[in-house]
From Swiss-Prot:
Pfam families: Ribosomal_L5 (PF00281), Ribosomal_L5_C (PF00673). HAMAP family: Ribosomal_uL5_B. This is Large ribosomal subunit protein uL5. One of its GO terms (cellular component) is ribosome. One of its GO terms (biological process) is translation. It comes from the Bacteria. The gene is rplE. InterPro entries: Ribosomal_uL5, Ribosomal_uL5_bac-type, Ribosomal_uL5_C, Ribosomal_uL5_CS, Ribosomal_uL5_dom_sf, Ribosomal_uL5_N.
């Protein structure tokens, strides 16, 4: 298992249990899954773009991404229902903890002009969503082999009931929220 998972079991659980007054260890919020999503609008014109995006996503996450398709036709965007328009990966278990560790310790500090993550990006149920403008912040991506710099969405799904609990959980891992 990843070091952050051991840190969670040894330190974070007891800290959150005393902070929020949980009676059982099972009430303590935990990270359930991390979802990475990359929308590739240019995939309509060139199929190679989606393949490159999928290979970048596979390198970042360590597992093969699912190609997402358009749910409905939109004439303004010139897409039809069923067209491939992006890719996504859902990480759970040990891969999730390894990715989370790389995100917090390596990738986020490599963001240019970084001033902290917005603490208001919680959804009301303790889940946190953030956007990354360039995939090259991850060490697995070779800058010279990238055809185009593209961003991705990262959603951290927790078992927290409120935003306050979710913020406390992520802050316990030194998640860099803006003050």
């Amino acid at each position: 298992m990843a070091k952050l998972h051991d840190f969670y079991k040894d330190n974070v659980v007891s800290d959150l249990q005393t902070q929020f007054g949980y009676t059982s260890v099972m009430q303590v919020p935990r990270i359930e899954k991390i979802t990475l999503n990359m929308g590739v609008g240019e995939a309509l014109a060139d199929k190679k773009v989606l393949e490159n995006a999928a290979s970048d996503m596979a390198a970042i996450s360590g597992q093969k991404p699912l190609i997402t398709k358009a749910r409905r036709s939109v004439a303004g965007f010139k897409i039809r229902e069923g067209y491939p328009i992006g890719c996504k990966v859902t990480l759970r278990g040990s891969r999730m903890w390894e990715f989370f560790e790389r995100l917090v310790t390596i990738a986020i500090p490599r963001v240019r002009d970084f001033r902290g993550l917005n603490a208001k990006s919680f959804d009301g149920r303790g889940n946190y969503s953030m956007g990354v403008r360039e995939q090259i912040i991850f060490p697995e991506i070779d800058y010279d082999k990238v055809d185009k710099v593209r961003g991705l969405d990262i959603t951290i799904t927790t078992s927290a009931k409120t935003d306050e609990e979710g913020r406390a959980l992520l802050s316990a891992f030194n998640f860099p929220f803006r003050k």
